[in-house]
Amino acid sequence: MVESLPTTFSDSVHIAVIGGTGLQSLEGFIPIATINPLTPWGYPSAPIHILSHNNTPIAFLSRHGTHHELAPHEIPNRANIAALRSMGVRTIIAFSAVGSLREEIKPRDFVVPDQVIDRTKGVRPFTFFEKGVVGHVGFADPFDERIAKVVRECGHALEGEGIVLHDKGTIICMEGPAFSTRAESHMYRSWGGSVINMSALPEAKLAREAEMVYQMICMATDYDCWHSTADVDVEMVMGHMHANGQNAKRLVGAVLDALNMRWSTIDSIRRRKNKPELANAQQHQIWRGRTYHFAWSISACYFSSE
């Protein structure tokens, strides 16, 4: 990114992309600003890049830091979500490298998960609800089916160009940074796990608490250790990561185009009905439907019923 970019951005940004291992930047997008918001939970993993995609501002955050210096248990997830929320973000598309727990999910394949099993150990701060702020959110369906549908449509449209996409799957989110034992890997398969990573949680839970729409896109780099014949070496994994990163950039561009098209249509309908207040900064409301409104200040957050 260009170092001389502005460090403030006054307009709301409604869509964010969180990049993980293998997707630490989004080349080809026009950089607008680089900001580093201070939240009640500290600074985010890295400065947030505001990029322009077809004249729409997009926020990009590198989950593991600018130079991939943060291990999964060191990621300031609350600060990341709070920083994006304070900028106006209401929709998050998150990418993550994963190990495959299924023969049919091959390295370089993409998975649009619909479920997650939490195998983290409580080491990571995992909620905004504390210190007198009490709240409970539903998490039966941890990812957003509306965004998932868009991702599936775009992914399948690109299948002739090297992208293979699986429509559903269950993530096993482990604590890390060590990988699974072979016994654990077989256990996760018996539970119905499709892929395994270290990043889905508490990121998805915090996004739900913050009333943000969240969908993860998984990029398989290798088979987990349950697989007896698929040897893994660093060179092979890095090759898969590079290919995944290139495919992810094409996929995210297509997804953003599709989302913008939907929002533009809703925007024009609302304007024709003489409701411009619903068509500008409040476009994100089409993705809402939660029980609480989330309000931020520099020092605290609170929830109030609708």
Swiss-Prot record:
This is S-methyl-5'-thioadenosine phosphorylase. It comes from Sclerotinia sclerotiorum (strain ATCC 18683 / 1980 / Ss-1) (White mold). It catalyses: S-methyl-5'-thioadenosine + phosphate = 5-(methylsulfanyl)-alpha-D-ribose 1-phosphate + adenine. CDD domains: MTAP_SsMTAPII_like_MTIP. Keywords: Cytoplasm, Glycosyltransferase, Nucleus, Purine salvage, Transferase. Phosphate binds at T21, R63, H64, S96, A97, S199. Transmembrane segments: none annotated. Its main location: cytoplasm. The lineage of its organism: Eukaryota, Fungi, Dikarya, Ascomycota, Pezizomycotina.
